[in-house]
Swiss-Prot record:
The keyword Transmembrane does not apply. This is DNA-directed RNA polymerase subunit alpha. Belongs to the RNA polymerase alpha chain family. One of its GO terms (biological process) is DNA-templated transcription.
Length: 331
């Protein structure tokens, strides 16, 4: 039996249903109910727009091919011209676990099809569609290409990657950073008691494989919530009520609470650090500072480099790991 929540006379959904039978790394179907009439479309449309435009992803932004001065040329021994190679590289699905720019390469000397599996990457970069064709060598000729991988949001045209004084031979390309391929939502009627004028929201998400649909949905909801926070009055009323008992909004207690209530996004950590912490359900600075260094090092993919990054970020706010603080906000 579904549990319902009422708030100020309005029906609210209590949980999100996930279709586990169809859930994969690239597809997910989610449902939530009941919404008051009209809220299903409002939430569904907002989530769809955020999913398609605002999630962070990785893409190749520039390439450099040995022997090619610009994209309107051909390379001896290569079936495709450079323009076709650029189009193929645009469809290469790249997953980067770092915010910094990375350079990946392709080197081949024998005839045959060059695919994503031939790309040489480092530990922070992964090629998802390894069977994707980049080009075809018709002869045993040396082929060398460098690709610049960056992180970003949405679609960024090649003109924003290029500069007047860029090195000859560097070819900027359009970058599709969004890891979301498609989003579809529908609203249908649902029942609460004897009333049937409520909404049920069904949301389907297709990704490129660099992020799973559940994580994508969570990230989109966080982004939407962060943009709505300034409109929520209790964010301003809370510190005033707290300061009346503690001696002012500028008191040390109030300042500490403000820092502890920050989210991980406020710390501007790297993608790797964020993913590691969120996998442990660490969502706020309050959650983070209560963890010890040893416990964090036990988290998968959380190494000394990431630990030093977290230490440095916390120290900027006068905080450190292993602190003893209240588990719940004081206001």
């Amino acid at each position: 039996m579904t549990m319902h929540i009422r708030w100020r006379g309005m029906e609210l959904p209590s949980s999100l249903e996930v279709d586990r039978d169809s859930l994969t790394q690239t597809y997910g179907k989610f449902s939530a109910e009941p919404f008051e009439r009209g809220f299903g479309a409002s939430i569904g449309n907002s989530m769809r727009r955020v999913l398609l435009s605002s999630l962070v992803g990785s893409a190749v932004t520039q390439i450099k091919i040995r022997g090619a001065q610009h994209e309107f040329t051909t390379i001896p021994g290569v079936l495709e011209d450079v323009t076709d190679i650029v189009l193929n590289v645009k469809s290469l699905i790249v997953n980067s676990n770092t915010d910094s720019t990375r350079v990946i390469t392709v080197e081949r000397n024998t005839a045959g099809v060059v695919t994503g599996a031939d790309v040489q990457t480092d530990a922070d970069v992964e090629i998802i569609n390894k069977d994707h064709v980049i080009c075809t060598l018709t002869d045993d000729v040396p082929f060398m290409m460098e690709m610049v991988v960056e992180t970003g949001r949405g679609y960024v045209p090649s003109t924003e990657h290029s500069s007047v004084d860029h090195e000859i031979g560097i070819i900027p390309i359009d970058a599709v950073f969004s890891p979301i391929v498609r989003v579809r939502y529908e609203v249908e009627a649902t029942r609460v008691g004897q009333k049937t004028n409520y909404d049920r929201l069904n949301l389907e998400i297709w990704t490129d494989g660099t992020i799973n649909p559940e994580m994508a949905l969570t990230e989109a909801a966080k982004i939407l919530r962060k943009h709505l926070n300034p409109f929520v009055q209790y964010r301003e009323l809370g510190p005033s009520i707290f300061s009346a008992a503690r001696g002012g909004a500028g008191s040390p207690e109030a300042q500490l609470e403000a820092k502890l209530n920050m989210t991980l996004a406020d710390l501007r950590l790297s993608v790797r650090a964020n993913n590691c912490l969120e996998s442990e359900n660490i969502m706020t600075v309050r959650d983070l500072v209560q963890r010890t260094e040893d416990s964090l090092l036990e988290v998968r993919n959380f190494g000394d480099t990431t630990l030093n990054e977290v230490r440095e970020k916390l120290s900027q706010y006068g905080l450190h790991l292993g602190m003893r603080v209240p588990n719940q906000p004081l206001f």
